[in-house]
Amino acid sequence: RAAVAADRGIIGGYGLGAPYGLAGGYGLEVPYGLAGYADYRYPAGACGIDAYGGIGEGNVAVAGELPVAGTTAVAGQVPIMGAVKFGGDVCAAGSVSIAGKCACGCGDYGYGYGLGAPYLY
């Protein structure tokens, strides 16, 4: 368990967390990663959601389930390894990329087998 939270473990500075992992400044997150927001110019109040107004920064590491009831607004990136299931509408401004096969059958080229190729939306 100590390796999970340690400096060089799964969540530490050289694992999945900041500053050099998947969620760090040089990984999938801003400003240099795949999900950089510099070119998207998100407008204030996008999707009917206004700015938070508070100041703060933090990391959330979840092993297992994270049930959320209500509305959750995220400004930034949410790197996910595994599966995600949404029930209802998902408001997204910017781009969404899916690497792998999704259950919607997209990319099955009309054969209906759901054997979709990797897609980038």
From Swiss-Prot:
GO cellular component term, pick one: egg chorion
Residues passing through the membrane, by range: none
InterPro entries in alphabetical order: Chorion
UniProt GO molecular function: structural constituent of egg chorion
GO biological process: one example: chorion-containing eggshell formation
UniProt function note: This protein is one of many from the eggshell of the gypsy moth.
Keywords from the named record: Repeat
Protein name in UniProt: Chorion class A proteins Ld9
UniProt similarity note: Belongs to the chorion protein family.
